[in-house]
Amino acid sequence: MKTIVRLFAILMVLISSVGFVGSAVAAELNPVDAKLTTEYGQKIDLNNEDVRGFRQLRGFYPNLAAKIIKYSPYDSVEEVLDIPGLSERQRQRLEANLDKFVVTPPSSELNEGGDRINPGLY
């Protein structure tokens, strides 16, 4: 009898673990996670980052970051230098940090609600 109970318990554990495999496969299909494995995960995306993402760069948060967001979307990283109303100092900061930016197509998953200035994270 004990052997039957043990076999039944092992069988139940094996059957219940099959559901976890399906969950792991579904998690791999997330488009945002897939994007993080590209250059987007290492650099600031000018078309998808909210204002808080620019805090890691000195002199960008919040004013210069807000200008960058206001005039997006961009087709290339260098296009950010054409923002109207940039001061000379802001232009210098942008030029010095061009290698820290990337441009990808705007994504609704990353811009939910369309508010990149105040994403509601407090």
Swiss-Prot record:
Location of this chain's protein in the cell: Cellular thylakoid membrane
Signal peptide: 1-26
TM ranges: none
Glycosyltransferase listed as a keyword: no
Cellular compartments per GO CC: extrinsic component of membrane; photosystem II oxygen evolving complex; plasma membrane-derived thylakoid membrane
GO biological process: photosynthesis; photosystem II stabilization
The protein's name: Photosystem II extrinsic protein U
